[in-house]
Amino acid sequence: MPELDRDTALDWIERWDRQQEESLPDREDRFTALIDAVEEGTGRPDPLVLDLGCGPGSLAVRLLDRLPRAPVSGSDADPVSLALGRAAYSGRPGLRLVDLDMREPGWSARLNLARPADAAVSTTALHWLPEHDLRAMYAELATVLGPGGLLLDGDHFTLDVKESPTLARLDLALRQREDQRRFPAGHSESWSAWWEAAAADPLLSGHVAERARRRVDAGHHGTESTQLATHVEALIQAGFAEVGTLWQRGDNRLLCAVLPAEYPSR
């Protein structure tokens, strides 16, 4: 497999970010709010942060730009994203990118954490997990976060169409209308078009083939776990004491969950 160089990787990541920003016009604002919450919520300059479903490292490097002393362990099961991140950010102090699948029990052991993590973060990734895998992942995550540890997840979280059919319909309609106003001629590059282009690049085609072999997105239809209520219920079941929305634009939300703090010794 030809070696992926840093400049090519950065070009592909820039193209990825551009494609994502068209689908998520408030992506940078959400990144900023998430990092604000990490900084404020952990209360230390060097929080140990887990980036779940890190992709090529878009969030991780923004975290390190703000908090250069924070060790960030990114994890993903996608070999293409990991190859891009490793080629682009090799040698970046504080950053580790780990190849693992959060659907597999015991996934957290592969992170080899030196201490309990202060925060776990994710953006536009955890909705890929089927509900039973999401619940198991949250339960395992709670075992590797320290007391008072945070989960911060930025994503499109939908309302329950059975419980709130009108609100759910309006929520979706507003997002679709905004998208049509911003891009009347359609997006310059769709998610699927980006992947088709990546598969045609000799420097990435081998990683794309490995992605297909692993069946990373087999059966994925984009709505496995998008309902807000599913995440809230799963997090409470996993032992998180507080769950709520910190930032929101339409159905684009930053969900925050907090583990109980240790009781003071008596």
Q: Which residues are covered by each model-predicted region?
A:
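Conserved class I S-adenosyl-L-methionine
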Residues: M1-P45, S58-R62, G106, L152-R181, G186-S190
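Class I SAM-dependent methyltransferase SAM/SAH-binding core
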Residues: L50, S58-W107
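Conserved glycine-rich SAM-binding loop
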Residues: G55
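A conserved beta-strand element that flanks and buttresses the S-adenosyl-L-methionine
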Residues: V121
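A short glycine-rich, Lys/Arg-flanked "PGG" loop and its adjoining helix->strand segment in the class I
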Residues: R135-P147
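Short alpha-helix
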Residues: T223-A238
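Core SAM-dependent methyltransferase catalytic element
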Residues: A241-R266
